[in-house]
Amino acid sequence: MAEEKKEVQKTPEQKMDELNRQLRGYMANIEALRAEISVINQSITDLRTAEATLRSLKELGKGKEVLIPVGATAQIKAKSEGVDEVIMSIGTGISAVMSYDEAVDRIRKEIAALEALRRALEEAIADLYNKIEELLEEVRKVGQEEAKK
């Protein structure tokens, strides 16, 4: 004999509680994604600064006097030796000597990868906002049903 499963009807309050939990979860996810985007934006800014600094030093040429920040508000004078070679971090505390062009190319590729990741996270946020809109519509329906009673 087949047993019939009886669907337990949720009260409007239970439905609203469940919808509110889902809404809070989506909002928490959005905030987490925004925090990740903020970190990515800072990394992109740092990489662009590095690229601009390398370009400026290359244009400056060898033998020019530059000021190097050493912390707080202190700077020291130094002479530019050019940027024919750049020491770049390649991960986990390891650095490698690269030509200027290789270093700039690597920086640009990192920026492009981070921008692609940022776009993906922004799309995920947009999807979450769409889900929130759907949930809000359900909240309105439940509220209207409750008001009719």
Curated annotation (Swiss-Prot):
Keywords: Chaperone, Cytoplasm. CDD domains: Prefoldin_alpha_GimC (cd23160). It is found in: Cytoplasm. InterPro entries: PFD_alpha_archaea, Prefoldin, Prefoldin_subunit_alpha. GO terms for molecular function: unfolded protein binding. Molecular chaperone capable of stabilizing a range of proteins. HAMAP family: PfdA (MF_00308). Belongs to the prefoldin subunit alpha family. This is Putative prefoldin subunit alpha. It comes from Aquifex aeolicus (strain VF5).
